[in-house]
């Protein structure tokens, strides 16, 4: 594991970046991006995920590639918010959106949903969930923000 003092400026900048790709496997141009620019982190979307076992294998592959090219373990991220913003397929654990959980009036439900999501993502090799988010519903016609 490398320290910041051992890194070049380009390598330090690469640690501040997260990159994603199309498809279930990283294409060659994505792997080249990691190698050339020392991209240190990965963001995954629904387009990258078939099921839990495939996601786990993908995360292991990505982790190995980034570690070999940068000397640093990456954050593998996703935004599994719940509700309409879910990245995991229906065969995996999915939770209601934040507005629906809040409507129950029980803070314990929010904790339980967060814990369940964290456990599911961790079991698949994801390190960092970019959720919850604090969306402001200032437009009632916005289809993304809602129950």
Predicted ranges, named:
Residues 2, 32, 119:
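Surface-exposed charge patches
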Residues 15, 27, 86-88:
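Active-site-proximal flexible loops/turns
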Residues 1-25:
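Boundary/entry segment of secreted carbohydrate-active catalytic domains
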Residues 7, 30, 70-71:
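Generic detector of short alpha-helix boundary/capping microenvironments
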Residues 11, 25-38:
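N-terminal glycine-rich anion-binding loops that anchor highly charged ligand groups
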Residues 35-147:
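Enzymes and membrane/adaptor proteins characterized by extended Gly/Ser/Thr/Asp/Glu-rich
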Residues 16, 20, 31-35, 56:
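N-terminal glycine-/serine-/threonine-rich phosphate-binding loop
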